[in-house]
Amino acid sequence: MTDLSDIRREYTKGGLRRADLPQNPMQLFELWMTQARDAELSDPTAMCVATVDEHGQPYQRIVLLKRFDDTGFVFFTNLGSRKAQQIAANNKVSLHFPWHSIERQVSILGEAQPLSTAEVLKYFMTRPKDSQIAAWVSQQSSKLSARQVLEGKFFEMKAKFAKGDVPLPSFWGGYLVKPSSIEFWQGGEHRLHDRFLYTRQADEWVIDRLAP
């Protein structure tokens, strides 16, 4: 077994105090996202999306956040993917943003609701054409005999859609994750990290400080 117990560092970039918290967690998330982008982090919108299968086995994957507002967090995916199939059976999910270099993380619990076709199409039309074509090519999570099969299909579809717009695949969609709780974690000196949990109760958010 590889021993990693000596790998550690101090967290010194700041603190988080109750008096500084807005009542709406989305305002704090917007501030932190802006600061993560300003800090030029690699992929600040990358989040871990966790789902579970019918046996309670959890699965995780990195997905890009594409939009957020007071209603929740939006991402897009192939509707034939493992994540989409699991969401169809159990729409309770968790999201996690690991912003290591600024010593912050955000953890979200909520329910994923499918977006309308109009909402999906609106975003799909903003994607680069090659990305639109790639959405047609990959049967996400299915087994492939070789990469060449995928590449061959890509160039086949690229020729097919060489002229005009690429239509929206019927098997491609998106989700709005409506949060029931959002936890903000700020690294602190001596492992005395700051953690605040926002929990939705009816139309309000209750804020609790958690022990690190």
Curated annotation (Swiss-Prot):
GO process terms (BP): pyridoxine biosynthetic process
Residue positions binding substrate: R8, R9, E10, Y11, K66, Y123, R127, S131, R191, L192, H193
Keyword annotations of the record: Flavoprotein, FMN, Oxidoreductase, Pyridoxine biosynthesis
Classification via InterPro entries: Pyridox_Oxase, Pyridox_Oxase_CS, Pyridox_Oxase_N, Pyridoxamine_oxidase_dimer_C, Split_barrel_FMN-bd
Protein's UniProt keywords contain Oxidoreductase: yes
Pathway the protein takes part in: Cofactor metabolism; pyridoxal 5'-phosphate salvage; pyridoxal 5'-phosphate from pyridoxamine 5'-phosphate: step 1/1; Cofactor metabolism; pyridoxal 5'-phosphate salvage; pyridoxal 5'-phosphate from pyridoxine 5'-phosphate: step 1/1
EC category: oxidoreductase
Reactions listed under catalytic activity: pyridoxamine 5'-phosphate + O2 + H2O = pyridoxal 5'-phosphate + H2O2 + NH4(+); pyridoxine 5'-phosphate + O2 = pyridoxal 5'-phosphate + H2O2
One GO MF term: FMN binding
Signal peptide start and end residues: none
Domain of life: Bacteria
Database matches in NCBIfam families: pdxH (TIGR00558), PRK05679.1 (NF004231)
Subunit field text: Homodimer.
Protein name, per record: Pyridoxine/pyridoxamine 5'-phosphate oxidase
Annotated organism of origin: Shewanella sp. (strain MR-7)
